């Protein structure tokens, strides 16, 4: 539940899921007869600071960066920011420093236009030109298609493509910064975001929380 921050680990068939509430991993290829370790990070705006507190404890217990221990890291909204940074190899303390630097600037902006502009600026400052081929483990960034009210999930591995292996492009060819901006754009507090895919399609997106504030089920589907 929003406001309650806890780490739980459960078995789900062949998957092992660690879900951090108020806040989701898959190597590029992994044997299907092995368990897939999933880290699921849900949305909650500035509550991402609580999520980072829980993740710091998990990282300390594991004694290694989280991307090395999770095969799939899925995130929605503020959880998408954390998921992307972890999957790129950042340690939790590094993510926390970035949060302290950028999140207050976004949240303190008054209008939708100002919030959207600051979110875009921060996303591009942090992620620059990084693409989904640059991550170190499996990732899923959840956004929502505005017109269809259905999820659009940015992934990095063909293992997550289900029946679309032939046409799969990591992240649909969209930069990580743009995917993060889309996943965090909670309309009407933020403006809708239009992304352009590698196939030339322009898709209008909003916050992933409108379809799955907790992306665990999507992650499990990709792991099976």
Predicted segments, located by residue:
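Cytosolic, low-complexity regulatory segments enriched in Ser/Pro/Gly with interspersed Lys/Arg
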Residues: 1-32
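An acidic intrinsically disordered interaction segment
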Residues: 11-22, 45-52, 172-189
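Patatin-like phospholipase
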Residues: 18, 32-40, 46-127, 166, ...
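Surface-exposed acidic, glycine-flexible loop patches that form ligand/cofactor-binding
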Residues: 24-31, 62-67, 124-139, 194
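Short hydrophobic segments within beta-strands
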Residues: 41-42, 142
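Glycine-rich Rossmann-fold phosphate-binding loop(s) that bind the pyrophosphate
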Residues: 43-44, 208
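Active-site gating loop/helix substructures
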Residues: 134-224
């Amino acid at each position: 539940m929003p406001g309650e921050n806890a780490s739980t680990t459960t078995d789900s068939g062949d998957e092992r899921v660690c879900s951090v509430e108020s806040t989701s991993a898959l190597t590029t290829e992994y044997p299907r007869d092995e368990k897939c370790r999933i880290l699921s990070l849900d949305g909650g705006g500035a509550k991402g600071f609580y999520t980072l507190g829980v993740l710091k404890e998990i990282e300390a217990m594991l004694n290694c960066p989280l991307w090395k221990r999770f095969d799939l890291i899925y995130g929605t909204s503020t959880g998408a920011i954390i998921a992307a940074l972890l999957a790129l190899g950042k340690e939790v303390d590094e993510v926390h420093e970035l949060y302290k630097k950028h999140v207050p600037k976004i949240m303190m902006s008054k209008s939708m236009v100002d919030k959207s502009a600051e979110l875009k600026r921060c996303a591009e400052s942090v992620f620059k030109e990084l693409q989904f081929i640059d991550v170190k483990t499996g990732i899923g960034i959840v956004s929502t298609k505005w017109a269809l009210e259905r999820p659009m999930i940015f992934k990095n591995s063909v293992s997550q493509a289900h029946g679309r292996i032939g046409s799969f492009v990591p992240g649909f060819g969209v930069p990580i910064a743009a995917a993060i901006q889309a996943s965090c754009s909670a309309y009407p507090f933020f403006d809708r975001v239009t992304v352009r895919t590698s196939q030339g399609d322009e898709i209008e997106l909003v916050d992933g929380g409108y379809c799955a504030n907790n992306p665990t089920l999507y992650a499990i589907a990709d792991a099976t």
